[in-house]
Amino acid sequence: MAKMSIKKILLIVLGVIVIIFIIAGIAGGESKESGSSVSSQEATTKTNTQTANTNSFIKPGMYKVGSEVKAGEYVIEATNNNGYFQVSSDSSGELDSIIVNDNLNKGEFRYIIIKDDDYIKLQNCRMYLSADKTIQPKSLDKIPPSTYKIGKDIPPGEYKLKATTQYAYWERSKNPRDSIYGIIANDNIDDSAYVKVLNGEYFKIVGIEATLVK
């Protein structure tokens, strides 16, 4: 009887060991699967991050120029009617630090030049390198509100402007960084006007529809 009891005990012990190994194997498998899932998620996150950084546009946010985005000329596109961008000399948030800023509606574009150590803030906007983005209106008979680079987006020449909203404004500028000193000519109109623009200028129209005359 004692020998039978020992055998039974040994069998029970062996059974317990086998069960432990089975449980450990299952747990190990789950751990590996879980680890693979995490790695996959990490890889996906890294891929998404790389895609976001190397994609054709820069998402809304605040960036330091030179470390997060390259200096250069960019095109900003509003993704809804509350689009806003701001270029600042520092991150103090003070009005004196603002170099240039503007509001724009969905589908409108603005040009901007940013330099190393600037800060660029994008709200409801996305930003493209100017070389990668051309703003081509469907027709030169009905050019919608935006900022256009003459010779790149629309041809030089004389344009007839027609006010489409109560606030109608046009502006010719030498560059899109100097919000005041870069302006060549500008005006508010109540109904219509003619404006001649030259190659390399930036032509901004707000609440206006433009038509190429010649």
Which stretches of residues belong to each language-model region?
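Primarily secretory-pathway and cell-envelope proteins
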Residues: 51, 55-56, 79-139, 165-214
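Surface-exposed interaction/gating patches
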Residues: 154-166
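Short, surface-exposed polybasic-aromatic patches that bind anionic ligands, especially phosphate groups
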Residues: 139-140, 145
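Membrane-embedded alpha-helical segments of small multi-pass membrane proteins
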Residues: 5-30
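Juxtamembrane low-complexity tails/linkers enriched in Ser/Thr-Pro and polybasic
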Residues: 1-3
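N-terminal, intrinsically disordered, polar/charged segments of Gram-positive cell-envelope systems
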Residues: 25-67, 72-73
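Extended extracellular/luminal ectodomain segments enriched in beta-structured repeat modules
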Residues: 69-72, 153-157
